[in-house]
Amino acid sequence: MTRLSPRARRALRELRAKGSKRSIEGMARYGIRPKLAYGVPAPAVRALARKLGRDHALALEFRESGVFEARALAALVEDPKALTSSEMERWVREFESWADCDSTCLSLFWKAPFAFEKARAWAKRGPEIQRRAGFALMAALAVHDKGAQDRQFLRFLPLLEAAATDERNLIKKAVNWSIRQVGKRNGRLNREAVHAAHRIAKLPSPSARWIASDALRELESPQVKARLKKRG
């Protein structure tokens, strides 16, 4: 690890002071077992991020530290306009758990100018966390990128169908999450996501059947239909 700046060291000391062994044990119960963690609650990490503000160089130092909470902090203080494609690739290879992956996609990666490109590329990867990142990023884009065109999300559907037979738990849940979020954007995408889910349901795979049934339960529900109709 390279030598950290005084500002980064102060932030890490503050994080460590807010950590607890009990929180680390709680993380483990959810399958979050990073190599190095302080056990800092998420609200405390977010509060520190607000105090620090956007800082690309500082974000890179936090990632370099290897500390789980510092890496979460990096995603919150990083400037998405300064984030490069190669840095995103490095980050996705360093993810240690679904929590690190999902929080980074939801708080940072979807804002990157090449987010759609990365989502499609990562969805074809082999390693479980990297592939999950592709689908987590799709879900984040579907929820947060209000200006994105339908065609960008339609390109996700074949990738979701292709991954539906991946029986790994983190992939199965991420594919389901993504198809549900895409299908809740508007009426057109709802229809296309429902069609995709019906195709997935016919695949000879327990994972595919679960993904389809759970997604259709929500996407065809009266509540979702009414909400989409109200949007027009």
Task: Show which residues each predicted segment covers.
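Alpha-helical scaffold domains
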Residues: M1-G232
